[in-house]
A protein has these predicted regions:
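Conserved class I S-adenosyl-L-methionine
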Residues: 1-34
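A short alpha-helix capping/helix-coil boundary motif
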Residues: 7, 27-30, 93-95, 155-159, ...
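S-adenosyl-L-methionine-dependent methyltransferase catalytic module, highlighting the catalytic core
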Residues: 14-18, 22, 48, 52, ...
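Polar low-complexity intrinsically disordered regions
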Residues: 1-3, 59-61, 187-189, 246-249
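Conserved SAM-binding loop
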Residues: 27-139, 242-248
Length: 249
């Protein structure tokens, strides 16, 4: 897979991937098969994904609430808050990448409206979020009542610097994400994962019981709860990260 070269010096300066291993690779794999065009990466983090995509011929712009974290050279950057108006013109982009961003937002509904505004007709939105609906997370919720580790006030101050923007404050599952996309005229065209989780196979008896139970559901109930998708290998058996690709119609 062709990518731009990231030097050791850049890595030492913090020019690193903040997403889980496999996420950027899957996004790049998808975009390599698409026509080159204008791309907005928001939130961009260090800018490493845009640096790689720029090396593949995409015309990239970067945006993030944290300007100090941006490390990429020769790529335009604007500071912006996804809870508010993203500072770019309407119908400007062929692609938007939003890697591990929505779960940090107080207002993901606003962000989705902004994505719709910024994309050209036929433009594609590539989103990654934590996969809270894989079988491992579902079992964790069953036994603990929480999808993630609870955050104490001490942890909030020491680990997250008392900033909500650093936390996962929206534990968004696939059904809500699908609703947000479709209510803004964005149709899902592909689901993917970062990488498989081998230890999922230890939960095979539970997986088999759930699938057998749902097999007896009436057709209308299966459709109403989107079981074809929520019990798919990408979601139910998926990795830590769910990648959703949608198109503006």
């Amino acid at each position: 897979m062709e990518q731009s070269n990231i030097t050791i010096e850049q890595e030492e300066k913090g020019f690193v991937t903040l997403a889980r291993t496999g996420t950027h690779e899957k996004i790049i794999q998808f975009l390599q098969e698409q026509k080159k065009g204008k791309l907005l990466d928001v939130p961009t983090g260090t800018g490493i994904l845009s640096a790689k995509l720029s090396g593949l011929g995409f015309q990239c712009s970067c945006c993030d609430i944290n300007a100090d974290g941006f490390k990429a050279d020769n790529i335009t950057f604007r500071a912006g808050d996804m809870n508010k108006r993203i500072p770019y013109d309407t119908n400007s982009y062929d692609y938007i990448t939003c890697v591990d961003g929505l779960e940090h937002l107080e207002n993901p509904y606003n962000a989705m409206r902004e994505f719709k505004r910024l994309l050209k007709n036929g433009g594609k939105l590539i989103i990654s979020i934590p996969n809270y609906l894989n079988i491992e997370r579902r079992m964790k919720f069953l036994f603990t009542g929480s999808f993630t580790k609870p955050v104490s006030q001490k942890m909030f101050k020491e680990k997250f610097n008392s900033s909500l923007a650093m936390m996962h404050i929206n534990l968004m599952g696939y059904p809500l994400l699908k609703f947000l996309l479709e209510s803004n005229g964005l149709s899902i065209i592909k689901l993917d994962i970062d990488k498989p989780k081998p230890k999922m196979f230890f939960l095979f008896p539970v997986i088999a019981c759930i699938k057998l139970y749902c097999w007896f559901w009436p057709k209308k109930a299966k459709e109403r709860y989107w079981l074809k998708e929520t019990l798919s290998k990408e979601i139910f058996l998926g990795g830590n990260t769910l990648i959703v690709i949608a198109e503006k119609r």
